[in-house]
């Protein structure tokens, strides 16, 4: 017995000295954190050592037997036993400590366990009575501190993490799916921050008190909201939530520029989440669910197509990888060749023949669609591909008319500006020039058809959405200029007609050569060189030229349909944006030198070899064409011997050329090259995104016939008009019937019995509806549940497949340490039991030996 106790004491002393030696070696330089006069008793030191290294038997024995132990004592870093046990992943020690009442720092231990991903320890801590009501999980450490509560405190100096970090936010930051799920079941949620420009009392007070902490708290909240773990587990529609959140974060990146990179990273994180969910789809039904939203309300038929609401939202928010994903593109391609499934697999030659056939027979196809819009041919024409071909062919014909309208002047001007030709001697010259030709009449019909199409688009999308698309602005500008041009031309024609009417009524001669006419009438007989600069016909011709240029530039709209020209069109658009950015600096430098050179030479008008810089207009022309090397150095030379002015002019002109040509133009070239490289590096995604935008404009119902065939209403249009009138009448009748029913119900409620019966019936119907809603999840919800399950499982597998890091090695080391103490305890118990057995055996055999010895002695005596 003495030998056994001696062995135990030697073993315990050896273990304790070894532990103290290890801790002393680690802690040595850090005793500076201790306050003066504070120290631990040997019992507390041993207790903290046992908790840190997972010595379960010692911790259990000290908690059960010691009367003087302070289990909330802290070490040199201010950590108590619970924090040390959690930090080293000792679940059994943590469970033993959580059984004690008035245990401190439970909240910090929870945050520590979440940050390290210790799920079982998190579950054990959440079962603590402190989290019974759930309020601890909804309040941030700062709010707890304001309530004079150090629940989340790391030590007396503050919290381990930021004051606004709640357990659910920390779990979301760490992408701990299981912990996030546990906290969500406990009722924890991440509150979405208020709008950046919110002026409520709470936001105003936080901004006034500490603007930096307010911004950081918003950033931490958005980091939690944008985490894949929180998005996938907290939202009923994770795809929609992620898309909207990505747009909000992108908007905040432009507002809070100090956190621009952080917000952009979070926005990209949301976009990657959406792409990851789409990548896990296994069949068409799941792809449709993501692209369209709730598939229960999507009807595939001849008259209805899926809404593609998620794709429209992704295009609006520029989630390019989502739109360019193969699953999304395959679905869009299927819809693009709707009712033309055989054409999809055909060669380019066959497709070209189909396009050529549509080009030749477009008028006949339009007539057939007017007569039978619901026939097989009508359904074929309503397919997106055929609508695209029809509109492209129509616009090509329109461009051809513009070319034909100018063909009479291709060989050069047949009449000089000072010459006039008329059909008969008494005809006024302007009547002949202002008449509309047959090509111009056709152009006007096309313009009216395009205006009607744009009006329908504005009616369907709304003015705000319409303005957001740059191509719509181009169409609006082009059509507006055409209308202004034709209006000015028509006004000139009216004035000329009035003059011709005056001549027909008041002039009796056969010719107008020797006739004295009033000035307002004689003006319309003059040749072009005598027209006023503000003449309506001159204005009309200038506007018409601008409209023609815009019309041909609109060809770029259909270029994304081709894989070769699509990236070039995207690069061109990006180049235009770069030029607009460059124009800010360009205009600033240009105006500075223009005003400076004008001030220098404005006093020398007529005293220069050319009029450069003598007026603002001449200064503009000289400096602008100097960029392209079309201005001469003689522009700064004076006829007088004013060398100082000339030298200043030479210097300014030279500095201007160096600044504009050498510096700024090369900077513009570098910007354009950089934009092109960005497009080229991700050309496939950029092109597919642009092509999807083009396709989507033809997926909507309506606008089947292109201009000008859309000006003639089809029988289908009359049918839809009648149906809309019918629906309006039905709604009106229902509203009247509902008002009568409400009056009747009010009469019923006057009776107590009827009132009770009415309320009971309403309650039963509401309960039945609620039960049906709760018991039957929608088809969309089932699909999203499957996809989110796959996403979570994939995320966990990817995380497990990562290389073993230093933290995991440390966890293994702590497990081995805890196992060592358990083995030592079992060994000690086994040694004690063996010593007891040996003692019992020795006692038993000792008695038997004594009896035999007595017998032998008695025998000798006898």
UniProtKB/Swiss-Prot annotation:
Record localization: Cell membrane; Nucleus envelope
Keyword terms, alphabetized: ANK repeat, Calcium, Calcium channel, Calcium transport, Cell membrane, Glycoprotein, Ion channel, Ion transport, Membrane, Nucleus, Phosphoprotein, Repeat, Transmembrane, Transmembrane helix, Transport
Basic residues bias: start-end ranges: 10-21
Phosphothreonine found at: 15
Classification lineage: Eukaryota, Metazoa, Chordata, Craniata, Vertebrata
Topology, Cytoplasmic side: 1-351, 405-465, 559-581, 673-862
InterPro entries: Ankyrin_rpt (IPR002110), Ankyrin_rpt-contain_sf (IPR036770), Ion_trans_dom (IPR005821), TRP_dom (IPR013555), TRPC7_channel (IPR005463), TRPC_channel (IPR002153)
Topology within the bilayer: Multi-pass membrane protein
ANK repeat intervals: 42-71, 77-106, 108-134, 163-192
Residues in the Extracellular compartment per record: 373-383, 487-537, 603-651
Name of protein: Short transient receptor potential channel 7
Glycosylation sites (chain numbering): 514
GO biological process: calcium ion transmembrane transport; manganese ion transport; regulation of cytosolic calcium ion concentration; single fertilization
SMART domains recorded: ANK, TRP_2
Assembly mode: Interacts with MX1 and RNF24. Interacts (via ANK-repeat domains) with PRKG1.
Entry-linked Pfam families: Ank_2, Ion_trans, TRP_2
A Gene Ontology cellular-component term: cation channel complex
PTM text: Phosphorylation by PRKG1 at Thr-15 negatively regulates TRPC7 activity.
Gene Ontology MF terms in the entry: calcium channel activity; inositol 1,4,5 trisphosphate binding; store-operated calcium channel activity
Family: Belongs to the transient receptor (TC 1.A.4) family. STrpC subfamily. TRPC7 sub-subfamily.
Cross-referenced PANTHER family: SHORT TRANSIENT RECEPTOR POTENTIAL CHANNEL 7, TRANSIENT RECEPTOR POTENTIAL CHANNEL
Catalytic function, reaction form: Ca(2+)(in) = Ca(2+)(out)
Transmembrane segments annotated in the record for this chain: 352-372, 384-404, 466-486, 538-558, 582-602, 652-672
Role summary: Forms a receptor-activated non-selective calcium permeant cation channel. Probably is operated by a phosphatidylinositol second messenger system activated by receptor tyrosine kinases or G-protein coupled receptors. Activated by diacylglycerol (DAG). May also be activated by intracellular calcium store depletion.
């Amino acid at each position: 017995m003495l030998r056994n106790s001696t062995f135990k004491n030697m073993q315990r002393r050896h273990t304790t000295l070894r532990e103290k030696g290890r801790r002393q070696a680690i802690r040595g330089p850090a005793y500076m954190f201790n306050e003066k006069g504070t120290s631990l008793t040997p019992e507390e030191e041993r207790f903290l050592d046992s908790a840190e290294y997972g010595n379960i038997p010692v911790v259990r024995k000290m908690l059960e037997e010691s009367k003087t132990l302070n289990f909330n004592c802290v070490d040199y870093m201010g950590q108590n036993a619970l924090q040390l046990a959690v930090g080293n992943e000792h679940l059994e020690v943590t469970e033993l400590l959580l059984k004690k009442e008035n245990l401190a720092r439970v909240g910090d231990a929870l945050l520590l366990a979440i940050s390290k991903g210790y799920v079982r320890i998190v579950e054990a801590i959440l079962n603590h009575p402190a989290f019974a009501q759930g309020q601890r999980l909804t309040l941030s450490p700062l709010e707890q501190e304001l309530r004079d509560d150090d629940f989340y405190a790391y030590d007396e100096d503050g919290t381990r993490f930021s004051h606004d970090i709640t357990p659910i936010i920390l779990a979301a930051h760490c992408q701990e799916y299981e912990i996030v799920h546990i906290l969500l079941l406990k009722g924890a949620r991440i509150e979405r921050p208020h709008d950046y420009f919110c002026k409520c009392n709470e936001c105003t007070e936080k901004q006034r008190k500490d603007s930096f902490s307010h911004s950081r708290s918003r950033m931490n909240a958005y980091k939690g909201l944008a985490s894949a773990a929180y998005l996938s587990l907290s939202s009923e529609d994770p795809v929609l939530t992620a898309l909207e959140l990505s747009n909000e974060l992108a908007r905040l990146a432009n507002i809070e520029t100090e956190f621009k990179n952080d917000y952009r990273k979070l926005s990209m994180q949301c976009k990657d989440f959406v792409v990851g969910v789409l990548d896990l789809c296994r069949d068409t039904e799941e792809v449709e669910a993501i692209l369209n939203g709730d598939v229960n309300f999507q009807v595939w038929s001849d008259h209805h197509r899926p809404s593609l609401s998620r794709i429209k939202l992704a295009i609006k928010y520029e989630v390019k990888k989502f739109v360019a994903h193969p699953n999304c593109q395959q679905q869009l391609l299927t819809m693009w060749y709707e009712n033309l499934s055989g054409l999809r697999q055909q060669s380019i030659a066959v497709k070209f023949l189909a396009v050529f056939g549509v080009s030749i027979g477009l008028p006949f196809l339009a007539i057939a669609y007017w007569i039978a819009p619901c026939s097989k041919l009508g359904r074929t024409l309503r397919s997106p591909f055929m609508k695209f071909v029809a509109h492209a062919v129509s616009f090509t014909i329109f461009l051809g008319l513009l070319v034909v309208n100018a063909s009479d002047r291709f060989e050069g001007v047949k009449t000089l500006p000072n010459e006039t030709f008329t059909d008969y001697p008494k005809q006024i010259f302007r009547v002949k020039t202002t008449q509309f030709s047959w090509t111009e009449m056709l152009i006007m019909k096309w313009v009216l058809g395009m205006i009607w199409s744009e009006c329908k688009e504005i009616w369907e999308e709304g003015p705000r959405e319409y303005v957001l698309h740059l191509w719509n602005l181009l169409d609006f500008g082009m059509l507006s200029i055409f209308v202004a041009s034709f209006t000015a031309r028509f006004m000139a024609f009216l004035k000329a007609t009035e003059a011709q009417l005056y001549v027909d009524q008041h002039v009796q001669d056969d010719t107008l050569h020797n006739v004295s006419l009033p000035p307002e009438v004689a003006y319309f007989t003059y040749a072009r060189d005598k027209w006023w600069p503000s003449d309506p016909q001159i204005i009309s011709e200038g506007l018409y030229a601008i409209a023609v240029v815009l019309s041909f530039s609109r060809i770029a709209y259909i270029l994304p349909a081709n894989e070769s020209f699509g990236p070039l069109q995207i690069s061109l658009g990006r180049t235009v944006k770069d030029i607009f950015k460059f124009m800010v600096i360009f205009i600033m430098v240009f105006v500075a030198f223009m005003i400076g050179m004008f001030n220098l030479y404005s006093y020398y008008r007529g005293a220069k070899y050319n009029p450069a810089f003598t007026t603002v207009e001449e200064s503009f022309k000289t400096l602008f064409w100097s960029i392209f090397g079309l201005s001469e150095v003689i522009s700064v030379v004076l006829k007088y011997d004013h060398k100082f002015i000339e030298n200043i002019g030479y210097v300014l002109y030279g500095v201007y050329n160096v600044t504009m040509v050498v510096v700024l133009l090369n900077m513009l070239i570098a910007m354009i090259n950089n934009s092109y490289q960005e497009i080229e590096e991700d050309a496939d995604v950029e092109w597919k995104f642009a092509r999807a935008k083009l396709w989507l404009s033809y997926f909507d119902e309506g606008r089947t016939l292109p201009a000008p065939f859309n000006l003639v209403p089809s029988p289908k249009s009359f049918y839809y008009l009648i149906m809309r009138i019918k629906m309006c009448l039905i709604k009106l009748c229902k509203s009247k019937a509902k008002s009568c029913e409400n009056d009747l119900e009010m009469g019923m409620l006057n009776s107590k019995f009827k009132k009770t019966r009415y309320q009971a019936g309403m309650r039963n119907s509401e309960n039945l509806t609620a039960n049906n809603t709760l018991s039957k999840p929608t088809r969309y919800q089932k699909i999203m549940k499957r996809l989110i399950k796959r996403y979570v499982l994939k995320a966990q597998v990817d995380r497990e497949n990562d290389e073993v890091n230093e933290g995991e090695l440390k966890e293994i080391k702590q497990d081995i340490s805890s196992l060592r103490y358990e083995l030592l305890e079992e060994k000690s118990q086994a040694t004690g039991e063996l010593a007891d057995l040996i003692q019992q055996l020795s006692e038993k055999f000792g008695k038997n030996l004594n009896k035999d010895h007595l017998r032998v002695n008695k025998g000798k005596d006898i």
